Amino acid sequence: MAKGKYAANILKQTRKDARWKDTYYGRRVLGLNVKADPLGGAPQGRGIVLEKVGVEAKQPNSAIRKCVRVQLIKNGRQVTAFCPGDGAVNFIDEHDEVTVEKIGGRMGGAMGDIPGVRFKVIAVNNVSLNQLVIGRMEKPRR
């Protein structure tokens, strides 16, 4: 390692080169996390419901978590989104427009006992899913 009076440039260049050994730095600078994200770095996204699916919970829990397959409008990618709330999936029909957001798992992954599900539904036809579940609003008829 350079220690002389005019060593600053060499030290700077060494730091620059060493940065690339850090996986997270490389992914961030090259934009790979945004490229791999179905929402493209956005906080939320709209999509069309293709079908309702039941996802089996991981051990030691035993349940069928109600989810929907959604095709995003912005890029056509398909994602599975969890429907939070008691009876929430009954308010969602095929071909409805839903708004999805990330579910909040660590490092952008799945949360809790729902394997492979990284998104959750927050609105159906521009009406909050939570409001529908508690009965405060009705779903608009198309």
From Swiss-Prot:
Keywords: Ribonucleoprotein, Ribosomal protein, RNA-binding, rRNA-binding. Disulfide bonds: none annotated. Belongs to the universal ribosomal protein uS12 family. This is Small ribosomal subunit protein uS12. Gene3D superfamilies: Nucleic acid-binding proteins. One of its GO terms (biological process) is translation. The lineage of its organism: Archaea, Methanobacteriati, Methanobacteriota, Stenosarchaea group, Methanomicrobia. It comes from Methanosarcina acetivorans (strain ATCC 35395 / DSM 2834 / JCM 12185 / C2A). GO terms for cellular component: cytosolic small ribosomal subunit; ribosome. With S4 and S5 plays an important role in translational accuracy. Located at the interface of the 30S and 50S subunits. GO terms for molecular function: rRNA binding; structural constituent of ribosome. NCBIfam families: PRK04211.1 (NF003254), uS12_E_A (TIGR00982). Part of the 30S ribosomal subunit.
